Amino acid sequence: DQCSYCGIYCCPPKFCTSAGCRSP
């Protein structure tokens, strides 16, 4: 998977934003 870290780990289909991990 292409998980990102933005305060917490965030894996598709969720995505990182300036507010943290968001759902699509």
Curated annotation (Swiss-Prot):
The free-text function statement in the UniProt record for this protein reads:
1 uM of this toxin does not show any effect on voltage-gated sodium and potassium channels. Shows a turbid zone of antibacterial activity against the Gram-positive strain Bacillus megaterium (ATCC13632), but does not show antibacterial activity against other Gram-positive bacteria, and on Gram-negative bacteria.
Give a brief account of the tissues where this protein occurs: Expressed by the venom duct.
Q: What species is this protein from?
A: Conasprella longurionis (Cone snail)
What else is on record for this protein? Negative results: does not show effect on Nav1.1, Nav1.2, Nav1.3, Nav1.4, Nav1.5, Nav1.6, Nav1.7. Does not show effect on Kv1.1, Kv1.3, Kv1.4, Kv1.5, Kv1.6 and Kv3.1.
Protein name, please?
A: Conotoxin Lo6/7a
Q: Where in the cell is it found?
A: Secreted
Q: Name one GO molecular function term.
A: toxin activity
Domain remark in the UniProt entry: The cysteine framework is VI/VII (C-C-CC-C-C). Displays a mini-granulin fold, a structure composed of two short, stacked beta-hairpins connected by two parallel disulfide bonds. This newly described fold is derived from the same cysteine connectivity as knottins (ICK fold). The name 'mini-granulin fold' comes from the structural homology with the N-terminal region of the human granulin.
Disulphide bonds annotated for this chain are C3-C11, C6-C16, C10-C21
Q: According to the lineage, what is the superkingdom?
A: Eukaryota
Q: Which UniProt keywords apply?
A: Amidation, Disulfide bond, Secreted, Toxin
Name any GO cellular component annotation.
extracellular region
Q: Which residues carry this modification: Proline amide?
A: P24
